[in-house]
């Protein structure tokens, strides 16, 4: 009996330290909470959650596996009401699913029984490598995760098709299956001494694709910041950047665009409900990137003149924030970056639909539109003119809204437990309500919370809030809602609380 009790204590401790990163959510003083800058992006984190134990590799001592409760058989049926989706982060759930089709099948049954109508399965995490068949990118074989008291590499030794396993299980129980990809991500410099991993670290020909950042000591490739201390990053004027974490591509690089379009074409071969772009943006340096020669040539073409002092005519070394509401050149830089993301999304939508006309195409974004321009993204409709409401917005910024190229949008309404109802932007309800006029009817959207990382959620025990959360999100988004992330539902055992909230919603129809 004592042994069993000890095992459950170990599992509880591991759960407390898993899933520690989220999809992006920023600081806002109205929350009274400390929030990290984007791991950005979603469904946009982190940037990397982690999870309960499973074998790491044959040579690593194994801890007890996460217990899986048996689920009753599920008969597919027509869903009632709006969409109810759950995000399944690759790294955060790798221990459970990387080497077990059975666990995928069992949890998909439980997801269905809880009242969800679909899942969003992450198939390209921040260290790059994919969990689907691709002629473009290597298969993912490992992620960094917390194992036996420290971060270690968790390896995938099975060769079954990870994404297809979710699709098959989804069809069996009647769940929609979306696949998400961390898009403008080139690799990851992992913490706790694990070091670099991913495409740009394993392929020297790709290193020129990485963002070039404007620092106090000149222009530096993002990989040159690997492992630097917080103090050193402050000296370089990039305090919001991290010495560890995801490294980003330059979205203006034509070779990057071609590579990612081929990757998405591979993904579109699957019988999916849809494809969702995550972290389809610039990196976490405000306006500090990308200042490569590639971007300089494209920016000069965009404005129709040469920039004599690069990058000083736009931003002084180490400066990545607007001067007031932005100088004329800074506003041109803002529009240019939004155009680069817009043009990629348009091309990606066209490429995906050329392979699979019936698939839904969309993106995850943070719902905080008022400051999301720092990520180089205008996720609104081109029919919405932000310059009417926001002094930072250039007159042409509306031209680079990309919502009209999407079939669905996922917005992260990542407010804390004390900010669920409300009309302001920094509440779950407000996030969801305020998105509708921005999309201007161009695209249906779902919104939802991060129930593991936002303030008030980090220690669990918030099941009583699920009816309030469901009401705030599902009734104020045109298509429905989502939860981030499945690992948090499992960690804090929110299954019954969410089921009750969904049942209450369906009874109201």
Model-found features: residue ranges?
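Bacterial Sec-dependent N-terminal signal peptides
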Residues: 16-79
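Active-site-adjacent "subsite" loops/lids of carbohydrate-active enzymes
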Residues: 80-101, 178-270, 326
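Aromatic- and glycine-enriched glycan-recognition loops and surfaces
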Residues: 96-114, 143-173, 255-259, 340-344, ...
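Catalytic domains of carbohydrate-active enzymes, especially glycoside hydrolases
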Residues: 102-129, 270-274, 398-411, 475-481
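Aromatic-lined carbohydrate-binding/catalytic grooves of carbohydrate-active enzymes
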Residues: 116-158
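Aromatic- and acidic-residue-enriched segments that line the glycan-binding/catalytic groove
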Residues: 131-145, 186-240, 279-320, 374-385
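Substrate-binding cleft/loops of secretory-pathway carbohydrate-active enzymes
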Residues: 186-190, 194, 285, 355-424, ...
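Substrate-binding cleft of secreted/luminal carbohydrate-active enzymes
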Residues: 394-509
């Amino acid at each position: 009996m004592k042994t069993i009790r000890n095992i459950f204590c170990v599992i509880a401790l591991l759960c407390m330290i898993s899933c520690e990163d989220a999809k992006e959510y920023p600081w806002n003083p109205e929350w009274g909470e400390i929030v990290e800058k984007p791991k950005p992006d979603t469904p946009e984190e982190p940037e990397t959650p982690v999870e309960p134990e499973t074998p790491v590799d044959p040579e690593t001592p194994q801890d007890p596996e996460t217990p899986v409760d048996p689920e009753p058989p599920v008969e597919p049926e027509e869903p009632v009401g709006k969409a109810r989706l759950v995000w399944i982060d690759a790294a955060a759930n790798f221990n459970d699913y990387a080497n077990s089709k059975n666990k995928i099948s069992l949890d998909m049954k439980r997801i269905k029984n809880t009242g969800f109508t679909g899942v969003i399965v992450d198939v390209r995490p921040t260290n790059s490598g994919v969990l689907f068949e691709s002629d473009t990118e290597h298969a993912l074989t490992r992620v960094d995760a917390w194992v036996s008291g420290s971060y270690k590499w968790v390896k995938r030794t099975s060769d079954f098709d990870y994404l297809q396993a979710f699709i098959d299980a989804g069809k069996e129980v009647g769940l929609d299956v979306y696949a998400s990809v961390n898009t403008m991500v080139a690799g990851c410099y992992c913490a706790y001494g694990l070091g670099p991993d991913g495409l740009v670290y394993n392929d020297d020909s790709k290193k020129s694709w990485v963002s070039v950042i404007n620092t106090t000591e000149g222009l530096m490739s993002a990989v040159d910041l690997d492992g630097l201390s917080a103090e050193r990053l402050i000296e370089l004027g990039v305090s919001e950047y991290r010495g560890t974490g995801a490294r980003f591509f330059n979205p203006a690089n034509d070779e990057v665009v071609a590579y990612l379009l081929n990757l998405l074409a591979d993904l579109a071969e699957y019988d999916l409900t849809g494809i969702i772009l995550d972290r389809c943006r610039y990196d976490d340096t405000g306006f500090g990137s990308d200042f490569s020669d590639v971007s300089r040539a494209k920016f000069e073409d965009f404005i129709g003149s040469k920039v004599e002092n690069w990058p000083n005519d736009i931003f002084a070394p180490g400066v990545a924030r607007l001067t007031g509401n932005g100088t004329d050149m800074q506003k041109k830089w803002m529009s240019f970056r939004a155009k680069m993301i817009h043009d990629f999304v348009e091309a990606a939508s066209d490429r995906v639909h050329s392979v699979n006309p019936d698939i839904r195409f969309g993106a995850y974004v943070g719902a905080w539109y008022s400051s999301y321009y720092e990520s180089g993204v205008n996720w609104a409709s081109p029919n919405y003119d932000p310059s009417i409401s926001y002094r930072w917005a250039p007159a042409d910024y509306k031209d680079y809204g990309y919502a009209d190229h999407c079939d669905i949008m996922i917005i992260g309404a990542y407010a804390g437990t004390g900010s669920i109802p409300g009309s302001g932007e920094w509440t779950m309800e407000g996030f969801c309500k305020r998105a509708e006029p921005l999309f201007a009817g161009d695209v249906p959207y779902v919104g939802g919370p991060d129930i593991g990382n936002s303030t008030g959620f980090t220690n669990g025990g918030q099941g009583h809030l699920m009816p309030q959360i469901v009401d705030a999100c599902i009734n104020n988004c045109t298509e429905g809602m989502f939860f981030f992330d499945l690992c948090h539902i499992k960690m804090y055992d929110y299954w019954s609380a969410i089921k009750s909230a969904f049942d209450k919603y369906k009874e109201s129809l």
